[in-house]
Amino acid sequence: MFTVVIVGRPNVGKSTLFNRMIKSDEKIKAITDKFPGVTRDINYGVAKWDDKEFIVVDTGGFFPEEKIEDIIQKQMLEQIEMAISDADLIIHLLDSKEGLLPDDIETARQLRQTGKDILWVVNKIDDPSKLSRIYDFYSIGTEELIPISGITGYGFDELIDKIIEKIPDTQPVNLEQQNLPKIAVVGRPNVGKSTIINALLGKKRMIVSPIPGTTRDTIDAICTYYGKKYLLIDTAGIKRLSYYKKEISQEIYVERLAYFKALRSIERADVAILVIDALEGIVNQDQKIAGIVAEQKKGLIILINKWDLIPANERDKKAKFFTDEIKHKLWFVDYAPYLTVSAIDKTRLTKIFPLIDQILEEYSKRVSTSELNRLFSEKLKDVIMSSHGKELKFYYITQVNVAPPTFVVFVNDQSAVKQHHIKFIEKLLRETFHFKFSPINIKIKQRK
């Protein structure tokens, strides 16, 4: 698909323009704010205008190589260069309020060396009265500048027209229509989520470093396994909610936005992969993240990462420890399979995909009403249970939805149904109809 990459210095408005271009309902698709450098990872989205579709790529702030100060900036620059190499069209976004700076001129020089098609776009021209700001930018070496405002939308239609003119008249591929399985990778900061994604993709799509919290935006990437495509979502590490109640600083503010983006990623997903640190075990925050997945009735795979750091002679004992730990601390997602993996060594990572396929097959499975009531007839119809002095009788059951499989059970007294009754029915459904790894949603209704 035709790919447009937005490049520019930190805080020139790249993410704001990106969000406007993809018209996303997810208003924080890319984290935006007044703080410089809040986009550290690459964001991908699909824009559709005038029956034309194209990929839009929002990059981190571009800066000359000689100004690199740390490992994070070095990795950011590598990501941007990779995105530029995949581009069909580059938007060099400039800031009219700050004016033309030496870094803009150096960036323009480097972009010209790529030989790619470039649009020179001057942002923060909120209305025609600000047009005089653009004249200094002609010295960058172009005959055409496009004045816009990512916030107000001034000049935006003209920019879209310019982009559409450059898209070949070929049938676009709609990523959403491909109906790819959507997989959210979730977990606490620094448990290895991005390393896992990078290993599955075979290239560095995300910043990976020993510094906790280096992924702040959710990132979508397509992974292919034996010809089948999966949409992988790497979320920012989810921290304790109490963490976000502290006094707001720049870092905490951005992390708070990232927290809610992570929740949105779980909402988007079909299956969530919860990454747990093998050295730290299952902690309270892991339980809370699993609880979010369970509440939303998403498929779940638990990955015990950093298995390479467990001494070989202790791994059997450690595996048994995690089996017991999952039963004890994650009892509410007892249907979820788990794997011990090493993102660094790429050990057992490919076992994820058969599990995803099985979960998705079960997740969309439909059981006929006749089969369900045959089960009830055999197991429950004549069974009368007591609950606090009340007689509870099950009449019949029907499946009303898939993704997740949702069943409605009709009883004589809805108030008498307790959680252990629901777990009993769930166990029957799982054993009889082979819902091994998928969540099941059971609703109780009183027969009138």
Curated annotation (Swiss-Prot):
PROSITE patterns associated with the record: G_ENGA
Disulfide pattern: none
One biological process term in Gene Ontology: ribosome biogenesis
Pfam families the record matches: KH_dom-like (PF14714), MMR_HSR1 (PF01926)
Domain (KH-like): residue spans on this chain: 365-448
GO molecular function terms listed in the Swiss-Prot or TrEMBL record: GTP binding; ribosome binding
EngA-type G domain sequence ranges: 2-171, 181-364
Stretches assigned to coiled coil: none
Keywords: GTP-binding, Nucleotide-binding, Repeat, Ribosome biogenesis
Subunit-structure text: Associates with the 50S ribosomal subunit.
Function: GTPase that plays an essential role in the late steps of ribosome biogenesis.
Similarity remark: Belongs to the TRAFAC class TrmE-Era-EngA-EngB-Septin-like GTPase superfamily. EngA (Der) GTPase family.
Protein name per the record: GTPase Der
